[in-house]
């Protein structure tokens, strides 16, 4: 497999990453046993159903790694370092049996002063088998140059990355029962949206 160097990335390029990945019971079992995750939503089918999910969703971090993993052959083979992430949004739940695919758009490029590397900024999107967006995020990587030296004609473009994820972008199922019998001993939460108090 021939990976790209810094010079091969251009603003606006779309990379459709190969080999979509179906999520299996085994993936989830290994993830839960390896990480020790005990989030009830991802750990208990009964809990998930009681609060309004159709079934037990896959842990968000496992989903992230599944989507991220599709991008590695196209983005990471000539990368020296993974420099950061921004604007990570889990848009829709994913379930065992779903198949996720990934696509990335080049949104920024910048030469580094050492002349040996550059920084590539990408926006990656994960979709399920129905074409629904399930995850979006930005990341930036330090990438090797094919040929060392500063390219005089090169124009840096550093994107304006999101500094936070707006709470309005969080996924909340329409039929979510936050205060069913499962939460009978908990206090009600009060969220402040601008000047309106919303009780959930």
Could you say what each language-model-derived stretch is?
Residues 1-11, 92-177:
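HotDog/MaoC-like acyl-thioester-processing domains
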Residues 88:
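Active-site-proximal cofactor/substrate-binding loop regions of enzyme domains
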Residues 1-84, 146-200:
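Hot-dog-fold acyl-thioester-processing enzymes
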């Amino acid at each position: 497999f021939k990976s790209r160097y810094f010079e091969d990335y251009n603003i606006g390029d779309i990379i459709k990453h190969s080999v979509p990945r179906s999520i299996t019971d085994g993936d989830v079992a290994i993830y839960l046993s390896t990480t020790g995750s005990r989030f009830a939503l991802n750990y208990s089918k009964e809990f998930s159903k009681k609060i309004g999910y159709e079934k037990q969703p896959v842990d968000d971090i496992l989903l992230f790694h599944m989507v991220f993993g599709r991008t590695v052959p196209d983005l990471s083979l000539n990368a020296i370092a993974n420099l950061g992430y921004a604007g990570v949004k889990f848009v829709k739940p994913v379930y065992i049996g779903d198949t996720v695919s990934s696509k990335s758009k080049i949104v920024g490029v910048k030469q580094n002063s050492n002349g040996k590397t550059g920084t590539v900024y990408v926006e990656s999107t994960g979709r399920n088998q129905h074409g629904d967006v399930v995850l979006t995020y930005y990341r930036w990587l330090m990438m090797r140059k094919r040929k060392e030296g500063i390219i005089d004609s090169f124009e840096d473009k550093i994107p304006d990355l999101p500094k936070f994820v707006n709470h309005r972008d969080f996924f909340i199922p329409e039929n979510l029962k936050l205060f069913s019998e499962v939460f009978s001993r908990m206090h009600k939460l009060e969220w402040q949206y601008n000047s309106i108090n919303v009780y959930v």
